[in-house]
Amino acid sequence: MGKRLLDKLWERHVVATNENGLDLLYIDLHLVHEVTSPQAFEGLRLTNRTVRRPDLTFATMDHNIPTKDVWNITDRIAKQQLDTLRENCKQFQVPLADIGDEEQGIVHVIGPELGLTQPGKTIVCGDSHTATHGAFGALAFGIGTSEVEHVLATQTLWQRKPKAMGIELKGKLQKGVYAKDIILHLLSKYGVAVGTGYVMEFYGETIQAMEMEERMTLCNMAIEGGAKAGIIAPDEKTVAYVKGRKYAPKDYETFEKKWSELYTDADAMYDLHISIDVTDLAPYVTWGTNPSMGVRIDEKLPEKHDVNDERAFSYMGLSPGQSTYDIPVQHVFIGSCTNSRLSDLEIAASVVKGRKVKEGVRALVVPGSKRVRDAAMQKGLHHIFEEAGFEWREPGCSMCLGMNPDQVPEGEHCASTSNRNFEGRQGKGARTHLVSPAMAAAAALYGHFVDIRKESYDGAISYS
């Protein structure tokens, strides 16, 4: 019997196995940010320990930083967390991408762009969306603060091996339909618990056609389906993406050979298998308070089936049978570790070029990193956004979560390219709708959702 990609990644990192069936995994890369690390570093101090492998640890500031004026941090707790991370990294000799550094950005954006993320690695971070890095054929997952301390101290982690789920994606996406729509479709069909106890492996002709940044979007939201991680076998596109980046391997040919072995064998069996044909897939919009509460843009909102639906409709101020086109949009957020990379910004810019944001709509573009921001500005994207009426911000997690000044007011609706739409996620009483960058950009122009596949809806939508 052949091996799955998960098996190969797991077996390469098992240091020991205990009597309870838990495996001690060696961790190749530990990513750190300001929110989940303070107690972990303090735990090292209290036990007089050091960071075992500072060279395999990398920290950045992302969750709490303001994106309008990065140096003016008025929130006392946010400032304390940022200052604490700076002090901890200095004391324990951990590399830090500080505010203003060219390497600073959202942790799951800078890992790949710096070449820290590589095929075959085990990668952890005190953040749910660590699964993003699985797009490179890495086993990457989020951990809690006590586990952050364990990895800092030992460079290992006790884990129970998950089961393997194969998700085959077949067909070619229509124009205006993206990886974000695939994952929202998957969640709407199978729910937020389908992946519980599993690692999702995405594969198939649709994956082969995708560029790396869309693959990252898919893996990023595997956690929203309950999965431990999302993974994609590395291929030529993966190798080309990593090659030449700052922290990429210098002995490239040796690593490339090892990476070529990372795939699921033809005779291997998944514990669970799902097949999706994306040919007729449409853009998706979430209407409720978890990522599985989504519909195609050309569908009506569903009927109420249980108390959860009842509560979601009430919180969102929407009704069963309502058209998605009738959902008002007062805020637009293009950013987050899901959709803030250069290709995401290029797609959004192509939609709004030469157009104007609807009066009464507040629209933000927040690049995922300093490097993304600089690259976008070199292409003139900031001019396109600003001329359209968008705010062009500094990199950070921003409006994805209500931990910094970028928040949605109570009772107002936001078209967001982020990954979670829970109650209060973007601020107290905020109503979040998850969409692709193209859909978010179009919503900014009209003040409601439109079908980006159509060249006109109340007027022309520019694609160039």
From Swiss-Prot:
Protein name: 3-isopropylmalate dehydratase large subunit
Disulfide pattern: none
GO annotation terms (biological process): L-leucine biosynthetic process
Cofactor(s) recorded in Swiss-Prot or TrEMBL: [4Fe-4S] cluster
Lineage: Bacteria, Bacillati, Bacillota, Bacilli, Bacillales
Top EC category: lyase
Gene Ontology MF annotations: 3-isopropylmalate dehydratase activity; 4 iron, 4 sulfur cluster binding; metal ion binding
EC number: 4.2.1.33
Keywords noted in UniProt: 4Fe-4S, Amino-acid biosynthesis, Branched-chain amino acid biosynthesis, Iron, Iron-sulfur, Leucine biosynthesis, Lyase, Metal-binding
Species of provenance: Bacillus cereus (strain ATCC 10987 / NRS 248)
Subunit structure: Heterodimer of LeuC and LeuD.
UniProt pathway annotation: Amino-acid biosynthesis; L-leucine biosynthesis; L-leucine from 3-methyl-2-oxobutanoate: step 2/4
Note on cofactor: Binds 1 [4Fe-4S] cluster per subunit.
Catalytic activity: (2R,3S)-3-isopropylmalate = (2S)-2-isopropylmalate
InterPro entries: 3-IsopropMal_deHydase_lsu (IPR004430), Acnase/IPM_dHydase_lsu_aba_1/3 (IPR015931), Acoase/IPM_deHydtase_lsu_aba (IPR001030), Aconitase_4Fe-4S_BS (IPR018136), Aconitase_4Fe-4S_dom (IPR036008), IPM_dehydratase_rel_enz (IPR050067), IPMI_cat (IPR033941)
Record bears the keyword RNA-binding: no
Assigned protein family: Belongs to the aconitase/IPM isomerase family. LeuC type 1 subfamily.
Gene3D superfamilies associated with the record: Aconitase, domain 3
Record's function text: Catalyzes the isomerization between 2-isopropylmalate and 3-isopropylmalate, via the formation of 2-isopropylmaleate.
Matching Pfam families: Aconitase
Binding site for [4Fe-4S] cluster: 337, 397, 400
